[in-house]
């Protein structure tokens, strides 16, 4: 029986994700599969590629032929080079870890609490604050008798 390693499409319109599967060469794209050996999510940045390397090596060794898209994925993960005894590919780009939402919220809360203690930033509010705090103190802009 001729087997192929191919992509089985899942997801909705304009949001595809794929399973990397081993199936009989005569089956349809989304038909019956023998074994699922990985996943591929092209829309995420960087795209997510998960391949069970041990199972991929097994199926390649028993003669399963990868389709062109799967061959490209296997080259990126290094499974094809391992099968063909070629040098390993350069390392893949790894997604940055996401920041913890709780820490972001707490930092924003601390910043908001610190904003209440700051002095007024607009001139009108600054004059009101100055007149309320120093009602008997002369204003800096007011002319004095000694200064003329």
From Swiss-Prot:
Native source species: Frankia alni (strain DSM 45986 / CECT 9034 / ACN14a)
Domain of life: Bacteria
PANTHER family given in the database record: 30S RIBOSOMAL PROTEIN S16 (PTHR12919), SMALL RIBOSOMAL SUBUNIT PROTEIN BS16M (PTHR12919:SF20)
Presence of the UniProt keyword DNA-binding in the record: no
Gene3D superfamilies assigned: 3.30.1320.10
HAMAP family associated with the record: Ribosomal_bS16 (MF_00385)
Biological process (GO), any one: translation
Protein keywords: Ribonucleoprotein, Ribosomal protein
Region annotated Disordered, chain positions: 107-148
Disulfide bond listed as a keyword: no
Biased segments, Low complexity type: 129-148
InterPro entries named in the record: Ribosomal_bS16, Ribosomal_bS16_dom_sf
Record-level Gene Ontology MF annotations: structural constituent of ribosome
Protein name, per record: Small ribosomal subunit protein bS16
Family per record: Belongs to the bacterial ribosomal protein bS16 family.
GO CC entries: cytoplasm; small ribosomal subunit
């Amino acid at each position: 029986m001729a087997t192929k390693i191919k992509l089985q499409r899942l997801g909705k319109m304009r949001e595809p994700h794929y399973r990397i599967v081993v199936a009989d060469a005569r089956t349809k794209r989304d038909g019956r599969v023998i074994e699922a050996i990985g996943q591929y999510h092209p829309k995420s940045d960087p795209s997510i590629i998960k391949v069970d390397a041990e199972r991929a090596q097994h199926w390649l060794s028993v003669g399963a032929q990868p389709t062109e898209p799967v061959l490209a994925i296997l080259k990126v993960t290094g499974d094809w080079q391992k099968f063909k005894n070629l040098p390993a590919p350069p390392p893949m780009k790894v997604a940055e870890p996401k920041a913890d939402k709780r820490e972001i919220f707490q930092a924003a809360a601390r910043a908001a609490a610190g904003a209440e203690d700051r002095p007024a930033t607009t001139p009108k509010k600054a004059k009101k604050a100055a007149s309320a705090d120093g009602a008997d103190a002369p204003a800096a802009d007011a002319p004095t008798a000694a200064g003329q």
